Amino acid sequence: MKLIERRQYLDKLINVLGTPDIKVITGVRRSGKSKLLEAFRAYIESEDPDCNIIQINFNLPDYDDLLTYRALYDYVNAYYVAGKENFVFIDEVQMCKDFEKAVNGLHASEKYDIYITGSNAFLLSSDLATLFTGRTFEIKVYPFSFSEYMEYFGLKDRYDALDKYVLEGGMSGSYLYKNQEAKYDYIADVFDTLIVRDIRKKYKIRNTQLMDRIVDFLMDNVSNLSSARNITNTLGSMQEKIHHTTVGNYMQYLCNAFAFYKVRRYDIKGKKYLSSNDKYYLSDHTFRYAKLGTKNMDY
């Protein structure tokens, strides 16, 4: 797959290179977290060819023996090289049981510069301070922006490129497929995996039908004012027996996993946030087209 230099993210990593922080790279599935680590590794090796980089990718079966924190901790220490700069890269760290114990232990030894990636539902911004004893530095990675899309395809005409970007979106893994139907199949699979693995697994969702209805509602009402109560009222009219607190929790879970972003209303005159009716946006707009179709495209 073709790679582009995602400089805005790479620069953030370079700026904290060598600091004692635990660097945490989060973002929606398939947004490029692993590729960013690859690019950062190449940068480090170009600057310090003699460094020692210990890299673990839990997406690969090669590391299935390291799925407990003790095994992970011992493995990293076994590959430590005295007298060199030692870096630890761990991809999809949440797949290791009690991973925070291993990371905290490695950090406490003060021997490693640590970088980890993970699914956002398992590495919440609000949880980082409680998971890790050391200071963390979070970098949030997003799907391709419009400018990155243009760079990837070498496009010059912004107007023509915008039409294509609206249809194809920023999930770069879909670019490998030849036709739009296949692209949307890929994007729908990414979203379904996000819902099933990241959200249902993390939060032990039992009412999966309700979760699906909330997802459909938010997708169909992107940029409209929404609240847990008005969604509850809408679904209640379909004879669903639900409570607005449950709906609100499910909406928060969707945001935790970067499926949606919540934008709060702001009172400019009063200079304060309003407490109700926020707007919700998808992390990539093509999730909507892949799941609901393109008949009502509104651009």
Regions found by a protein language model. Name each.
Residues 100-116, 120-121, 129-130:
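Conserved catalytic/switch belt of AAA+ P-loop NTPases
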